[in-house]
Amino acid sequence: MNMLHLSDRNASLAPSGGEHSLPTGGAVCRDAMDILPVILRAPVALLLLLVVLPQLSVGAEANVTVKVLSATWNWYMPRKYVTAINAGFNASLKSRNWTVAGSVNVQVVYPSNLDLMPEDFIKKQLELETDQNKIVIVYGPLGDKSVMHSIPHLMNHRVVAFGLITGSTFIRQWNPYLYFLRADPAAETLVLIRYSLCQLRVLRLGFMYLQGVHYGDEEYALTVNVMSRMGYELHGVFTVMSPDGKPAPDAEFKEVFERFATALPQAIIVFGAPVDDTAKFLMMMAVDERIARSYILSPSSVQLSLIEMWQLALEAAGASFAPGQLLFTGTNPLAKDSQYTAIKRFQEVMSEYLKAHVGETNITEADYFLTHDLEGELMVYGWISGEVLSQALSNLEWLKDRATFVRSLYDQRRYVINDIVIGDYGGTCEGDAAKHGATCECNQGSKAVYVKEMLENGQKTSVRSGFTVLKASLCYTDSSELHGPLDGLVVFMKDDDIASKAAALWQKGTSHLVGKGDLGYSDRFFLHAFNTTIAEAANDLRRDQGERIVTAVFGPVTEAMLDTPNITFIDPLELKPRLNKFRRNVIHLSPTLEQQLYVLSSYLAGAGVGNVDAVICSNEADGIADFLRSSLTEFAVSLRSAVIREDGEDVGKYLPMSGTVFVIGLSVPDVKEIARKLEERNDLRVIVLFGEFSFLYDLFATALNNTAGAARLVFATSLPHWGDTETSSKTAQLFHDVEKDSRLWTPLSVLAFATGRLMRVILLHVEEMSPETLVNFFYTDSSIVSDDMRYGVFDDTKCVDTANKLSKNGCASNYGATQISVWSMARALNASIPPLTNPMTPSMTFRNSNAGRISGASLVGIIIGGALALFLVVALGVVPYFFLRNTVITICTKDDRPVTLIFTDIESSTALWAAHPEVMPDAVATHHRLIRTLISKYECYEVKTVGDSFMIASKSPFAAVQLAQELQLCFLHHDWGTNAIDESYQQFEQQRAEDDSDYTPPTARLDPKVYSRLWNGLRVRVGIHTGLCDIRRDEVTKGYDYYGRTSNMAARTESVANGGQVLMTHAAYMSLSAEERQQIDVTALGDVPLRGVPKPVEMYRLNAVPGRTFSVLRLELELLNDDEDQTTTSCSDHSSSRTDLSVAAQTIAASLQSLLGTFTPAQRQKALIPFCERWRVPLPQKVGNVWDDDGCQEVVRRVAAKVGRVMDFGTRKPSSSVTSWKGVEVSSQVEERLL
């Protein structure tokens, strides 16, 4: 890529006077000769002469004149705008004295008559050129028709048009003679949609365009497509047929307009060509009260005509201009946008030019471009065109002839003008250049689009939130880059300083994560300040919801706001402490009041505290006191007193002289009083809630900094330390990377940042976004991981209340904070001070406080008896057993934490049993032994086996991955004592290749030496998934089983893998830490459809044995298994009776029924289970634990159907390469289809 920088107007170019600013060739030679020994000077001089003479001959011919034909005008463009765009172009070249690269002279030819069409001017001038190698460039033209009519002339004379301006997408095609500098109309269309939905947040967006004028048709189709994909639709479309600008019939026009206005669009994207029907539309809009104040959003190509039309419409309607109602996209900054370095340089150059060329421009003010925004914007575009042209002419070798010059323009070119970037440009590529990053057949120019709003008196201002940059790696605009937005509100309550300050900190914390215009998934999260008062907050929110898109509310809220339907509240910070109520649309990420009290009670018990006091100021003081008492009682701590304090009462009079006191419900004056009491009373410990602590953090930090009392102010949090620069927390590291101001390292800022990171994680997984979509994600995924923060379990299931559930809502859970630890204020101020407790995720379950009360004597007896029993256990050697099982119990009994499940299965096991009945018993026994050794090594839990399939649980995702990887390596290096298994696998592949011409055997045709390094013995496929499970204890086996979506997903993952392959879901992969992910080698497989799973699942392949290759995933094979259950280790509700049995299957069924007819159901059950396990026949769920006659009959039919299919295939394939065993001929293809 040629990176041509122009940070100074004369960089690499000749300054005034025409002399090079760098040392001349003669000076360099003299300096070099001076340092050489005398004996070497003559040979070196001769060598230099031989090198320089050819260059001097080239230089003698190097004075080149490049002619530029200025075609930047059109019939609908007022003369002042033509002057502006040409003045900017001239200013760039004049700053170089019309000379580039020291010897390239630029000569600009202007039309003598602007009544002439640009295409005619171009044609006439090119026909006058007799030397077809002389470089001629066209500056312009403007407008789609002029460009289209000019193309034949440009191509005939091999001349390139620079800086042309078009309005429609259809003309932005690959043509090496059209050199676009601006972003294309499709990009501007996407930005108009983005701004409407993400910044204006309009609920109803309309679209206006005319048919028959070759403008707006493609942009309308693009808008409909993009809106639909995002889950939106247009509210009102105005379009009439205006062929070549002729007006549509009046009656038809009015009828269409009435339908359009009835839809009440709040904003209208107007692709109105500069013709009468566009002016008529605006006239009617200006007088229609329904839409007169709707936003008008238009692309840059029609802004000049549209502004004039709208002003005339307002005058006719007697209406005043509304600043901000008219919005336009633009492809370059305004002339007054001095935040850009390039614009600062433009301002200097432009001022100098205007001072010196008053006669040519009729502009007397040197800063005219600062006070006339429309003309100034065009001057900037002209100046950029001149800068690009100067760089394009900067090498004499490129100017040898027209063909060479055209090729040079597409030699992977990019133009950097300070902080404005134009390009990449590329021509026709060879071979796989495009795959390696080359830009091919691209003439499209800038990727930046700006949004500007019209103010009064023709002034404009840039809207920073509208600035958008499309992917530079893509030549043409990709509409899939625009995704449905998450429009969030942060509530500023102007009558509460503390709440407003908290909202400001919250917004600042997420400011680094909201959309910045880098189109893609990182540009989907948007936050808007919502100003209100405490009293009116709920009503104002409902009004805003009726007028604007509101996906979610973040930060401080009032209790009344939480009752607003159809809005999701993400981690709301209530102004007053309240107990959590299950509202499905309210998602708590921070510890709830209940969770905090539970964790703090546990801490107090561990600290040896026997009783505590509480001072509570809240409308729910009684309920809070009851919950605090229950939490303390759970941990054998007593609540000695609970005082209910009125709002405004002095907290100091309620604080005890010593001991521990919960202070719930804080106000600003309370901070100093608590700090004073802590300083005075060395034995006093004060516990506060995290939400209130975060609201008042600055006050607490000021009052307790460098005091002993800081160690005795206590709270609970799930956050990493906001001020720890040596932290291992990924969240905190990322926060510090983007927020350099340490004054903003506060609890609220890092809380907001963590929440923003979570929103980004969610947005990666959903295309459409709405309040319902957002809240459903939490309850569907249950547990969500973002960096090092884990949230969940979220559960909206309504369960039956049980005695040990304190929550009145049964199982429903809308809170998800995990890993909550207890801190002191001293730690908050100094990260090197450790937390008071290790992190814990509270179970939130309580024992019955009235049950089990015993007397002191009984308690002594129990203690003595327990001690004797423990002695006997130790003596009998049971302790080691329980020690070894400790990990198992930890894994199996906690269903509030994600678990990683591993499913394994031997590839083609049925076929192997049929082919090698003498080998497989020992092979399967070895298979079981090796896997169980690994289960023990990695402290996992063997849930169950069915035949040769294992289901394994692990509390550590990394341990699960290590187990799967070592499993493959163990099987590879094990001495199986026979080659029969490998030979069979190769035969299976060869047979399949014969039957399927599209199939390529991955191992059958490998060189034996290569094969031995990659494959050996049984091939086991493995699937890994992480998530929450319903864990149940089997009272018969005394083991644990895992149910739910996680086990099904893990089984489905295994079922699509090939033998020797390890697949892991995105959830499993992302459950690994960043450090753990670096230790494994994976290949991303993209989204994989799984049977029974609504959406494709992102999948990764663990490269356990480097060099192994596999067939495509077994997706079609799984689909053929529709009569089986969702897991290989569970029952099924599908019945074989739902399909007709083949003749072979009927024979088998009849034989089994005859053999088992005299058995009791229990005996038949015992006899049939081995057949089911060996043939992988899932059991119907309806049979239960004890089979009746109908259940036995159903199982017989299932076994018969499975074996019958194998026999039928064997009959059709008598030449199978697999040996016959006991009358059943098995082929690898049947095995693959069945298993």
From Swiss-Prot:
Record topology, Extracellular segments: 54-858
Chain sites annotated for binding Mg(2+): D905, D948
Enzymatic reactions: ATP = 3',5'-cyclic AMP + diphosphate
Ranges where the Guanylate cyclase domain occurs: 900-1054
Transmembrane domains' residue ranges: 33-53, 859-879
Keywords of this entry: ATP-binding, cAMP biosynthesis, Glycoprotein, Lyase, Magnesium, Membrane, Metal-binding, Nucleotide-binding, Receptor, Transmembrane, Transmembrane helix
Official protein name in the record: Receptor-type adenylate cyclase ESAG 4
